[in-house]
Amino acid sequence: MDLETFRKLASDRRVIPVTRKLLADGDTPVALYRKLAAERPGTFLLESAENGRSWSRYSFVGVRSAATLTARDGQAHWLGAPPVGVPVDGDPLAALRATIEALHTPHQEGMPPFTGGMVGYLGYDIVRRLEKIGPGERDDLGLPELTMLLTSDLAVMDHWQGSVLLIANAINHNDLDTGVDEAYADAVGRLDAMEADLSRAVAQPPAVLPPSELPEYTALWGGPDFQEAVEDIKERIRAGEAFQVVPSQRFETPCTASALDVYRVLRATNPSPYMYLFRFDGFDVVGSSPEALVKVEDGHAMVHPIAGTRHRGATPQEDQALADELLADPKERAEHLMLVDLGRNDLGRVCEPGSVEVVDFMSVERYSHVMHIVSTVTGKVAAGRTAFDVLTACFPAGTLSGAPKPRAMQIIDELEPSRRGLYGGCVGYLDFAGDSDTAIAIRTALLRKGTAYVQAGAGIVADSDPLAEDQECRNKAAAVLRAVHTANRLGK
C-alpha cells in the first residue's frame, strides 16, 4: 500500500492495515512467534488443525498490542491508551462492544480472515452481567472477567503459499483527521522492524520429547464430593428444575515450563481446531479446544455443539467399536440432541427467522485421548445485529452449562466451590471488520506463579452414573495435564 492509497482510506476509517508479504517456507508458526513476539506479554499465537489432523491454511502471530482491555474490581480497566471515544470504566462488556464499534473497518479484498481486532478471552463468570445466576462470591483465582488485546501488529502465515503477511495496523486513536502521513510512516517503520526480526537467528535446540505421563495433581473438588454433587443434580433434574447440568472440577499441577513449551507439547500431542497461546500481564493461557462457541463470518453464524464422549481405543477395531457404542448410547444421543436444540434456540435469538438449520448432525470426531459426537448449526445474522450480539446470545455454551441455561447456571453456582474463571468461557477474537471466531475455553491451562490450572466438566442427566461422570472429567483434563508434565521435562 502506498501513501496515496493510505490517505484515501484514512478519510473514512480509523484502522488501516499496512502489509508486506514475505516468503516463509522455512519457518514454522512457533519459530515466527519466537522471532517476532519473543514471548512478550501482550502477544499470542493462534493455530488450527481440522478434526485434530490436517493443519488449516492460516496461523496468526500477535506481535504487538496497542492496549489491553481487562477488568479490575468489576470495572473496565485499560492497560495502555485506549482509543478516544470508548469507555475507560464501567461494564467491561460495554467497553468491548464500544471499542469494536468505534474501530469498525470494512474487510479488504484478498486479505486473510483476521487482520486485527480484540483478541483474548471472556471468562465464564462474565455471564453474571447477562443473566441472574447468583453472586459467585467464592473466587480463589481472582482472574479478570475478561482480557482482550487491541492487536496492532501481527503476522499471518499462509501454509498453502509458504508465505507470511506482516500487518501493521495504523489505528487512529484520537479520531482526528491530522497526522495521516505520520501514521503511515509509523506503520511502515513497524513493518521494517518485524522484517528485521524475521531475519535474525533464534536458537531452538532440539528437545528430547519424554514419554507422556499423567503427573501428580490435586483436584479442587473431585472424588466423593463431586459424586455427591452429581446425585444432588440428579434429584433436581427429577424434580423438574433442569434437563441437564454440567458441573466441573479443577485440577492443579506444578508448572516449571514456559507457556511456549507447554503449547509446543500440546499442539504436538493434542492438535485441535482451536489452539492458542496467550501471554497476558501476570498469567498465561494455553489451550487446544475442540469446540467452537460461535463463529460469525460475512453475516452468517455457526455453532458446533459437542456432547457425548468416549476414550480412544487401543486399536482401530476397538476405536470403531467405541464410536459405534457412543452413537448407539441413548443417554449420549439424548444429551446431544438437547444441546443441538439449545444451539438452535441461541442462534434463533439473533438470526433471521427461518434461517437457522442443522447442517451436520451427530458425526464422530476423534482427538488424541477422546472422541465426541458433534453437530453444526448455522443461521443468517439478522439486520441490526452484530457479531458481539451473536456472541453474547450464545454465551456461555450449553455444553458447559446445561439446559435450560439460566437454571443450570444457578445450580452450578450453588454447588461448585469457586468461580470458574476462564473455564467454560471463550477464547478468540472480534475483528475490526465485524466478524468473530471464538472457541469454548476447554482443554485449556491457566499458567500462573508455577502452577497450571486445568478444569473439566461432565453433562449430568437423570440417569448419570456419578463415578463415570467423575472419571469423564479426569479423562478430559488428561491431555492438558500430560502436556504440562511433559513440558516440565523437555530436554531433561
Q: What are the roles of these predicted feature ranges?
A:
Residues 1-492:
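Extended alpha-helical targeting/anchoring segments
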